């Protein structure tokens, strides 16, 4: 009983501390380009070209006045390919994730695009009980011992005839 009162008091104090401040507005989501993967590839190649142009223009400016600063420029040169490689690997990773090559990604894409076809379990299009609703096969409809239907194996269950 004491614990429930303590919890109620804690909730009341929490409400007073928050003082009804509204939550910050959610940030709008960035929309994907309308062209799908090809538009994204174009956008990535444009970004890579811009990065290469920026690196190319900063290269001669970073050289400086010459003299003894050669060691500093030699240390700066390996960092440019690393960043370029990192950007290229990130871009290729994005494109690899978007590419529907494998069976799993194609199946997932098909389920997303056509959810009505994949509503239930089981095979054969439709819900899970589509096989249950079908009738028995014609050869199973023949009468077995004592006029009872035979099961799928073709033997009578428990009657032994």
Swiss-Prot record:
Keywords: Cleavage on pair of basic residues, Disulfide bond, Hypotensive agent, Secreted, Signal, Toxin, Vasoactive, Vasodilator. Residues 29-60, 76-93 have a biased composition (Low complexity). Expressed by the venom gland. It comes from Rhabdophis tigrinus tigrinus (Tiger keelback snake). InterPro entries: Natr_peptide, Natr_peptide_CS. Its main location: secreted. Disulfide bonds join 145-161. GO terms for molecular function: hormone activity; toxin activity. GO terms for cellular component: extracellular region. Pfam families: ANP (PF00212). Residues 120-130 have a biased composition (Gly residues). SMART domains: NAT_PEP. Belongs to the natriuretic peptide family. Residues 19-135 are annotated as: Disordered. Residues 23-139 form a propeptide. Residues 1-22 form the signal peptide. It comes from the Eukaryota. It is found in: Secreted. This is C-type natriuretic peptide. Residues 94-104 have a biased composition (Basic and acidic residues).
